[in-house]
Amino acid sequence: MNIAQKIIQAHKLKFGSLPPLQQCSVSGSALFNADCMDSLPLIPDESVDMILTDPPYNIGYADWDKFFNIYEITKEWHRILKPNGSVFCFAGWSFVCNVINQFDKNLKLNDWIIYDRIKGRGGRKRMVSTREDLLWYVKSNEWVFNKDKAYSTIKKKTKGMGEKNGRDTRALSNVWTDISPIVPWSKERNEHPTQKPLQIGERILDVFSNTGSIVLDCYAGSGTFLEAAKNRGNTFIGIEKEVKYYDLAVARVFG
């Protein structure tokens, strides 16, 4: 029985019925239209290699705090994550300190990545915001890191001796400036208000997971990270509460 089947069976036993879902029987992947606080407790212990997610931090502090019960969720994440697993979680700048304070109670902060999307927001009464914060948490000291894939592209080829001469890549830092943001004319753009570029998900999976890993996105949105997992040959479990975004993700990943 694969992980999707185990979740489905547990949901039926607990609630007496199944949530709307799309399932790929070949890979064992599934996308559930459900509240993650209902579904996370149904996932088996130490069964997930990576949690890659983007919680809805743009809905206002009070509502966000209710929607995203940080402490309870990180307890579940710690339980379901394999010993060498990683969590990659986006956090809006106005919430990031609160997120870290709660995450640190259950997981270990391994790095703090800044995605510079170049295109800014705001600017009327404060500086233009071009950054997005991506927190990398681990469960132990045995995380996955594929050094041979940890590189970023640069605009001008390097000059130097030997292998450094003429390179168009460099070692990956924790400030990412080489990934194009989603803009109104982007081909992959859809109706989700905080959609992330597919390339971000693919980079995270390339560098910090192995092919065939089980990837969880419990705030799946329009399915960006699920598509990235599918593209990289991973099994994915997606959970999305909002029907309109669930439908977008179904069309994107299973269409």
Which ranges hold each PLM region?
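PRPP-dependent phosphoribosyltransferase catalytic core
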Residues: 247-255
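Short, compositionally biased
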Residues: 15-16
